[in-house]
């Protein structure tokens, strides 16, 4: 499944639930495995970094391509297709012995179902926000979720925020203000119906606000729910249950709340672009799996510190992809917003690294040393 993510930005203390994790790592090797040569391609740190960045850009661009259709309104159906593709992909990987995780358990599914509902809310509102906003603005505003999660940790888990982290939050808010101002300024000054364009942007900002609230609720709720499910292979199991449990819910929602008349289907899937749209929907589902694998690969062959910095730096190419592949306005204010948002991500990553180097006392749980590759990857499958 998509989202948003989210990322890179949500380092959660998993109470060491990731110990013994097998997610997106090769199945247990036979005794006395051979150590790969130092020059092995799979151990080249450049490749996983590029693959991780490419996967993130691919998922965002594919989602925007589908959602930017003239009248696309089958968002629940899009999310359902992505969930089905993700389940097929990870089950195929399990059958081939590439990954391992526990079989389905009704008791675990029952405990995890509330989190799945929060995830559906998160990815649906994220898809609506991305539908109305440009990729650069969407990427910039997504940073605000970090602030909500941080202070949620302060309120409910007894954490604290350092001065450098607080400074990065200020930059995130500033970049969002600049981005909104640049968008509205461009809409007013451009040709056409300025009122309609501003109205569209306002709808996007509202969906983005709701998405930030849903995302923070999902991440904070997931932190508490992990203790109930006792997931050891957390990352793959969370992805498995999230997608599997969401499929019937999304089928019901798309059947009841979306227009399945032949006219609307033709409007959403015009004959000239139908195959491309279907391909993009499938590829966007696969890309969430790619992100999970490549982020785990990145941590395995580099370090958690490198991974944190890559996550921060990755925001720039994602934002730029909106300028390259879509008609996002290229103005001085919009570029300034991207730069400030990019700097805020770097400052936040540096703040996390500094906190990880200090004793754990007085530090937010989300700022403790990053968890294993498997738990790291879950955050990235949430970005959209």
Swiss-Prot record:
InterPro entries: SCL35B1-4/HUT1, TPT_transporter
Positions annotated as glycosylated: 264
Compartments it resides in: Golgi apparatus membrane; Cytoplasmic vesicle membrane; Endoplasmic reticulum membrane
Segments in the Cytoplasmic topological domain: 1-40, 91-110, 152-160, 222-236, 298-305, 351-384
Any single GO CC term annotated in Swiss-Prot or TrEMBL for this entry: Golgi membrane
PANTHER family associated with the record: SOLUTE CARRIER FAMILY 35
Entry function: Involved in the import of GDP-mannose from the cytoplasm into the Golgi lumen.
Protein name listed in UniProt: GDP-mannose transporter
Lineage: Eukaryota, Fungi, Dikarya, Ascomycota, Pezizomycotina
